[in-house]
Amino acid sequence: FNDLVQLTQGNPKVDGQQLMQHINQSLTLRRQYMQLLQQLAFATSPVQAAASSATSSAASSAARIISRKSAEFELLFKPDKQFSGQVYVILKIPHSIEKHHNQGVRINCCSNELISSIHFPPIVDGKTQLLMEESDQKFINMFDAEFAIYLS
C-alpha cells in the first residue's frame, strides 16, 4: 500500500512501470489506486466525452483530442518537425509547487479497464515536456477523451 501512495504522490524513486503492471492486473489494486488519486491528485481532467456507438476503431479515432485544459494545467502536443512519428508532449502548470520543480510531475491516465502513468521532468518556468512516439500507448491514453487525467 505504501508503494501505491508513493506512486500517487509522484515519487520518481518508485518503480512505476512494475507497479503499474501489478495495478492493471488486480481490480482491487486498481480501485485502491483510483481512490488515492481522487484524494491526493493536485489536478484532474475528467473523461471528455461519452463513448461513441460506432465501431471500436472509429470510436477510438473520434475520441482523440489535441489538448487537455483545466484551471491547474494544460497538456498539449506538437509533432516533431524533423522526425515523423514523434511528438513533444508539453505540460504547462502556471502555479506549480516546489515539489514539481524538484521531482517533476506524474500524469496518470485512467479508464475503467486501464491505468497508465508517465513521469515528466521537473517544471521550469511553468512547463515541462517529453519527446514521445505517436504510437506509444501512454501518449495515446493522455489524449484519449475516454481517459480521465490525474496529476501528482
Language model segments and positions:
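Acidic-aromatic/histidine active-site loop/patch
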Residues: F1
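N-terminal amphipathic alpha-helical interaction or autoinhibitory segments
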Residues: Q6-Q35
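Generic alpha-helix signal with a bias toward terminal, lower-confidence helices
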Residues: T8-N11, Q35, S45, H119, ...
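Generic preference for flexible, low-structure residues
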Residues: M20, Q35, Q39, S45, ...
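Short alpha-helical interface elements
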Residues: L29, T44-Q48, S116
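C-terminal, beta-strand-rich globular interaction domains
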Residues: I66-S152
